[in-house]
Amino acid sequence: MVISRKLMGALVVLGICAVAMSDVMAQQQTPRTLRVINYQGDMTLLLAAVSDAYGVTVGLELDTQPPRQVGVSLLDATLTDVMNAFVQSTKRYQWRQTGQFVDVWPLAGSNPLLETRISSFDVKDLSPSEAFDQLLNLPEVQANMTALNLKRRAPDASARNVSSSRFSVKLEGVTLREALNQIAKESRIEIWVFRNYPNGFFSISSVER
């Protein structure tokens, strides 16, 4: 399932003015900064804007509590600045960056399903939703879901399938989390959301770019 940003509200509430960067600076991999960030609102929307602004793919694992509102006010902020301010505001999450990927997960711990090892995943000309379905139907994922007594459910009513983008991806020897990151990157949805619910249920959705 894919959550359209239009359905989630206007991202313009995040007041961001990007600092211009020369080609030389880009080649030197100078950290990108945002001149002004003044945001108060849904945490998922903030992370969607972070993905756009800094050119990273975000993997968000939500705990069983309702997503909370966050407040971030920064000047000349790097990605690290924004993410540190985010976790300080939520007080329930932690984060890490690995190359172009930013992972966010609960302080209380991650769902072990996301660490399931996947031997091979090779799909062609699929939508993100179709790729999610095929990924979660892999034998190793299904076996781990059974062992952990987990069940997939549909995302909340605010989510619907809106993405028509098609893409292909081939992966070997990755975790479920890493596979979700690659799906998000290759399909350009840029952020996926794994939400934990009580009683062993979970959902996977994404935010379309």
Where are these regions (language model features)?
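N-terminal targeting/assembly segments of extracytoplasmic apparatus and virion spike/baseplate proteins
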Residues: 2-209
